C-alpha cells in the first residue's frame, strides 16, 4: 500500500508532498452542481450513499488528489441527536436554537447508529477509490458544532455560544461532553467502514480566549482521540483548530492528534516550528486559488520552500470557495507536483 498521505501523517517526508483540498467536492465543480440538483436538498445528498459516493469521487477523477474526503457535513451529528436542520441557499445551515434545559434531555444512546448511510458511503467509496488514494473521514469538534446548535446558524464571532457558555456552564459542559462522546462513536464507525484516517474540524476555535480554548477545544478533542484510540489504537487523526494562532503550540501534544491542520493566517516561520514536532497540513489562502496567476504561484512556492523538506500534506488553509476557477486548481496541483504552469 502506497498511500502518501498516511506516510506523511506517520511523520515521513514525501516529495513532492501529497495534496488534497478541504471542500474539494463542492460548488466550484460543474459535476457537483449537477449531482446536487439531482439530490433535491443538501441533506438528501449527504444521506444518499450513491450520490454522496459520486460527489466524493468527482475531484479524484478530475484532479487525481492524493486523498478523498467523505462527503457529508459536521452538523449531521446534532441532526442525529434529534435537532432540526436545514440548509438554505445563501444562508447556510439553519437550526432551532437549543436552550439550557433541552440539553439535559438530549439522548445520546445509539445516536451514531442513526448515521448508517454515512458509513455505507465510506464503504462504497473505499471500494471504488484507487488503492493509492487515502480516504479521510471527519467530524466537527464539539465546540464548533455547539456554536451552531446554540445560535441556530453561523455568526461572525460566535458570540451567542460564548455567552451561553459563561451563563450556563453546567449545561454547556454537558453539551460538549455529549457531542464528544457521540462524535467519537461516529469516527469509530467511519474507521470501521474503511476510512484510513479522520479529521476533526474545529472551525471556530479562533474566537475563544486561552482559558476557553483549553476547556472547550483541547479538552474535548483529547476526549474524542482517547475514545477512538481505545477501539483503534493506531488510528490516524488530524486536528484542525482554525484560527488558533499561538495556541497551535502544544495542541498536538495535549490532544494526541497526529497531524496539525494549519489555517492560512499561521506564519510560515511558526508553521515550520510546528512541523519540527510532526506532520502539518496546509496552508494556502483559498483566495489565492480564486486569484490565480502570480498570487497563486507565490503562495504555493512559499509553502513548499518553508515546509517541503519535512512531513507536509499540501492543502488550503480552509475550504475552497465556489468562485475558484477549475484551471487555477489544476495550476496549483501542477505547481505542487513540480510542473510550472
From Swiss-Prot:
Pathway linked to the protein: Porphyrin-containing compound metabolism; protoporphyrin-IX biosynthesis; coproporphyrinogen-III from 5-aminolevulinate: step 4/4
GO CC aspect terms: cytosol
Main location: cytoplasm
Keyword Lyase: yes
Coiled-coil ranges per UniProt: none
Catalytic reaction annotation: uroporphyrinogen III + 4 H(+) = coproporphyrinogen III + 4 CO2
Pfam families: URO-D (PF01208)
GO biological process, one term: protoporphyrinogen IX biosynthetic process from glutamate
Record-listed substrate binding positions: 23-27, 73, 148, 203, 318
Subcellular location: Cytoplasm
UniProt GO molecular function: uroporphyrinogen decarboxylase activity
Enzyme Commission identifier(s): 4.1.1.37
Main enzyme class: lyase
Sites marked Transition state stabilizer: 73
Keyword terms, alphabetized: Cytoplasm, Decarboxylase, Lyase, Porphyrin biosynthesis
Function, as annotated: Catalyzes the decarboxylation of four acetate groups of uroporphyrinogen-III to yield coproporphyrinogen-III.
Family named by the database record: Belongs to the uroporphyrinogen decarboxylase family.
Quaternary state and interactors: Homodimer.
NCBIfam families: hemE
Name listed for the protein in its UniProt record: Uroporphyrinogen decarboxylase
Organism in which the protein naturally occurs: Brucella ovis (strain ATCC 25840 / 63/290 / NCTC 10512)
Organism ancestry: Bacteria, Pseudomonadati, Pseudomonadota, Alphaproteobacteria, Hyphomicrobiales
Recorded name of the encoding gene: hemE
